[in-house]
Swiss-Prot record:
Its EC number is 2.1.1.319. The gene is Carm1. GO terms for molecular function: histone H3R17 methyltransferase activity; histone H3R2 methyltransferase activity; histone H3R26 methyltransferase activity; histone methyltransferase activity; protein methyltransferase activity; protein-arginine N-methyltransferase activity; protein-arginine omega-N asymmetric methyltransferase activity; transcription cis-regulatory region binding. This is Histone-arginine methyltransferase CARM1. Disruption phenotype: Neonatal lethality. The lungs of neonates do not inflate and they do not breathe. The same neonate lethality is observed with mutants that produce CARM1 protein without enzyme activity. Embryos are distinctly smaller at 18.5 dpc. They show reduced lipid accumulation in brown adipose tissue and reduced amounts of brown adipose tissue. Thymocyte differentiation is blocked at an early stage. Mutants display complete loss of protein methylation of the CARM1 substrates PABPC1 and EP300/P300. Residues 347-380 are annotated as: Required for nuclear translocation. Residues 28-139 are annotated as: Interaction with C9orf72. The modification Phosphoserine is found at residue 217.
Amino acid sequence: MAAAAATAVGPGAGSAGVAGPGGAGPCATVSVFPGARLLTIGDANGEIQRHAEQQALRLEVRAGPDAAGIALYSHEDVCVFKCSVSRETECSRVGRQSFIITLGCNSVLIQFATPHDFCSFYNILKTCRGHTLERSVFSERTEESSAVQYFQFYGYLSQQQNMMQDYVRTGTYQRAILQNHTDFKDKIVLDVGCGSGILSFFAAQAGARKIYAVEASTMAQHAEVLVKSNNLTDRIVVIPGKVEEVSLPEQVDIIISEPMGYMLFNERMLESYLHAKKYLKPSGNMFPTIGDVHLAPFTDEQLYMEQFTKANFWYQPSFHGVDLSALRGAAVDEYFRQPVVDTFDIRILMAKSVKYTVNFLEAKEGDLHRIEIPFKFHMLHSGLVHGLAFWFDVAFIGSIMTVWLSTAPTEPLTHWYQVRCLFQSPLFAKAGDTLSGTCLLIANKRQSYDISIVAQVDQTGSKSSNLLDLKNPFFRYTGTTPSPPPGSHYTSPSENMWNTGSTYNLSSGVAVAGMPTAYDLSSVIAGGSSVGHNNLIPLANTGIVNHTHSRMGSIMSTGIVQGSSGAQGGGGSSSAHYAVNNQFTMGGPAISMASPMSIPTNTMHYGS
């Protein structure tokens, strides 16, 4: 059934028909498609009648919240057809670049100049009609309230700025794309969840011929403004909508995206990233290409007691005369269900991390609905295990080199930080013991995961477990330097301070005996509080690094160190490590940590 009346008008006639109920208002967004052709088909008298406009027309679509107003104009700006298309309108796509609308006993076939024009028109129409004819994969897996909040959040320029100012993130993406320019030169690119469009601009810098930038939030409008102001409208096409619901006019050579959340999987955008492979050519690539989740046991009595102390508020027998103690158990459960988002000194880790890898080129969406990570840790230290720490690395495996982006605690801090999941009952383990178990992540419709962790010390049989809600983390990061664990000093710090000073030229800060050049002991003598130590662990082959002091809560930019002697690679391969500020300083025994995955090609480790 037609939603509104429409009239086809012969050449030279004035406009006819009006937008029906629910039609687009005067403030709606207008999209223009030149070169359209119109064919009217009817059988009012029992015979098929056809009328085709001989000249190309200009089609205008005025998008509204519930319907789209469509009008076609001749070169003389005479309206030859006008109607409103809502969710009740009978309509369908025809072939690769045509669309048919049935109004009463007449049908109107609109042919667009290019398949790209048709896809843009079709995406606008689907958005206006509310997608009620079929539910997309995204809609099936996501609660509406969660989706609304999610896209509203990413529609703010301030949030885009927060991500763009994570210079490790942004700089690594740009370096990965530009250093692998042959993967982009004259290629077709799909940017999934483009946000401000920054990755699309990087692809354009690398020489991409066409970039389709898909964005479901209102940020798409801002991205379109940036595309126009940077004179890239001929190469970057912003497509408003979800990648599960829009249409692309052609297959692409490479997909780029920044789909990672806390613990890699939070927000479930990785599934949209994998869904986009329906547009990827068989020989196509994806940036990022693989993702590694690392987990390791940690000890942190201070964090553990913080959570219990908060819950002890409910242990009061007389709070303004009310006994709250009956809720203390529920409060403990609630606080310990929260994953803790912050950073930490790497020396709290008690074993080498276990790695779980997702190859985005091979993985399917369903693989991320239930993620089971078995682990077996060989304990390097004795003490209480308070939980598991998580971080991730992603690799951009290009034709020229592989670039890594890491959120490891040894690396410069990013807006992903690290995540820790506590046990309600800590486990005691000795050096040489094995801690085994499973971390199970079950996807939920709130665009997140329910986490179940079960761990056991094999030698004693002692076991602990916890259930956590990744959608409701505790943001603990304060911008201050994380403290090393108690008992980390194996010589006198006071003596070391003065002994170290004797090896320095205090006026110039010249390094002696391999100490970092930027360490100025005069700051210690003046008060010591300005010396920034973060994630204190000496790593082999890191080279001399500039150590800068950052403001509280800031995301730091990178320094550069070339030619690490510990570079890996085959014969003739090159390796560059873009090292960072105050992440690597001296102190404490090293803990063996899993390094980024070795790829048999030229590799680069930028800002990570």
